[in-house]
């Protein structure tokens, strides 16, 4: 359960705001408004998971991202092919139980190292060294916790073994996406996060919304890829998960 912290000087701060507005501070009778029009819920409304996947695939070329479909059984070979296509290691990954659930542990800990492919699995006890590994890595690999079909965005919940820099510092980023994680858009992701907070569940202090490789553009619409993050990105969708 999420622990409630102590808020200091809240009443004083709110009273200052109320004074500036020229009214008394409201301490009761405040309710969340109900908006008559809520178009955010109608985007891809009623879509099946297959239809959401097609929407995600259609968006990927627009965000300069390759999308590859595979199955849980074929995931290991698919991942090996994608990594090789991007130039191989060094590789950095999260310390995530899903790698074991998807049959990738042997690849990370044995097969690639035996082929002289350097693999670093995030180690919370190593501190800054993890960031150094990520900085030198050619490929970073994580799972997507929620995937937004409309924008082609993967949502990552950072944590003790799930450092932000795994998806940020390597030249290439690979996201493994379970098809079941695909939702229409940001609306559903925000609703899920809000629901977890309402239930008192612990929410990561860092939640990242990543839409393909790093893209930067100036006022003249000159696009530069890779300035603030990976130069390339690939989404591997596991269609039977």
UniProtKB/Swiss-Prot annotation:
Database matches in Gene3D superfamilies: NagB/RpiA/CoA transferase-like (3.40.50.10420)
Organism: Geobacillus sp. (strain WCH70)
The protein, known as: Lactate utilization protein C
GO biological process: lactate metabolic process
Domain of life: Bacteria
SUPFAM superfamilies: NagB/RpiA/CoA transferase-like
Biological role: Is involved in L-lactate degradation and allows cells to grow with lactate as the sole carbon source.
Family: Belongs to the LutC/YkgG family.
HAMAP family linked to this entry: LutC
InterPro entries from the UniProt entry: FTHF_cligase-like_sf, LUD_dom, LutC, NagB/RpiA_transferase-like
Pfam families reported for this sequence: LUD_dom (PF02589)
